[in-house]
Amino acid sequence: MAGHPKEKVIPDEVHQNQILRELYLKELRTQKLYTQYHVNPLRKIHTVTRKPMSWHDNLEEPADARFLNLIHHAAQGPRKKYPETQTENQEVGWDLEPLINPERHDRRLNHFRVCSDITLYKAKTWGLGDDHHK
C-alpha cells in the first residue's frame, strides 16, 4: 500500500511555458546592470608598480579629484567623518570632555598622597629591602 507508484503526469506545453515565463521574470527582477565602476575606498589595495622603461606608463595623467576625495575621506577617523556614533563600540571614548569639572583643590574627589612621620618611616624601611631590616 505504501509503495504504490503514482502515475506521472506529463505537463503540457502551456504549463511548461508558464514555468519558463516565471523563471525568466524572476531572473529579470534580480538582475542589476552596473554601468559605473569605481574602487572601494574602504578596502586596502596593493599598488602595482610601473615598468620604469616603458614610454606609455610614464605619461602624466591628470588626477581625479573625486577619487582623491574618496580616498582622503576613507583615511579619516570616525570622529572626523561622522557627527554621531555609528556603532555601539564607538560610543566608548567618543566624547573627550570629562563629565565633571576636574578641580584640583576639591578634597572630596582628589585624594592626594599625604605623608606623615609614620608613612615616611615605613617608606624608608621598605626601600631598604627585607634583608636589611631584619
From Swiss-Prot:
Main location: cytoplasm
Disulfide bonds: none
InterPro entries in the cross-refs: CFAP144
Residue runs in coiled coils: none
Keywords: Cell projection, Cilium, Cytoplasm, Cytoskeleton, Flagellum
Protein localization: Cytoplasm, Cytoskeleton, Cilium axoneme; Cytoplasm, Cytoskeleton, Flagellum axoneme
Any Gene Ontology CC annotation: sperm flagellum
Annotated GO biological process: flagellated sperm motility
Keyword set includes Cytoplasm: yes
Keyword Phosphoprotein: no
Segments for region (Disordered): 76-95
One Pfam family in the UniProt entry: FAM183
GO molecular function, one term: microtubule binding
Role description: Microtubule inner protein (MIP) part of the dynein-decorated doublet microtubules (DMTs) in cilia axoneme, which is required for motile cilia beating.
Quaternary structure and partners: Microtubule inner protein component of sperm flagellar doublet microtubules.
Family per record: Belongs to the CFAP144 family.
Official protein name in the record: Cilia- and flagella-associated protein 144
